[in-house]
Amino acid sequence: MKNNLTTTITSGKFKSKKLSLPSLSTTRSTKSIVKESVFNSLQGEIYGSVFIELFGGSGLMAATAVSNYAKKGYAIELDRAAFNSLRENFSRLNDVNETLVALHGDTFELTPKILAQNIEQKTILYADPPFDIRDGFSGIYEKLYKMLEKLEANIVVIEHISSHKPSQNIGKFALYKSRKFGNTTLSYYTKCI
């Protein structure tokens, strides 16, 4: 049976384009109010950046970043069915420069490799791991923090369950802002100089 769930890009050059959403049994789509908050907060940072969406799902955040003139957008997704939706979404939006890249695999393995390929670029990481209350995902935030401690990026945004208290510092990153939206919170980190 074909999944008919969709979401819409609401700004930039892809405005009004629809993306297919993977099954809600395997992913949790970012709420519109949360997405809008991220892009309002990062408005001055997106242009010309490399935007990497960890735990990519439909690729909505990476696609919205490229829609708002990020140089390149990556989305990493492990679940095969979700990745198929992601790849289809990006193939409908991509231009000849292949500005959107869908990657099937483990976020914890692929993120350092993508960053290594874009070492000279301004990079923004957007992490939306499955909330740790889901089966098989306890400890996901600690695992994410451990990976981030070893990485170089300019900005990191983590979407997490509001009951989780985010770390003030993660390696070279310092928390500079949090915004709560009911059960979801966005925590913003910047690279300490």
Regions found by a protein language model. Give the residues of each.
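Short, glycine/acidic-enriched loop or turn micro-motifs at the edges of active sites
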Residues: G56, R80, E109, F131, ...
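Conserved SAM-binding motif I beta-strand of class I
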Residues: K72-E77
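S-adenosylmethionine
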Residues: I114, N118-A174, K180
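Core SAM-dependent methyltransferase catalytic element
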Residues: K177-I193
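S-adenosyl-L-methionine
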Residues: M1-N68, N84-Q121
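Mobile, glycine- and charge-enriched loop segments
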Residues: L42-I52, T107, T111, L115-A127
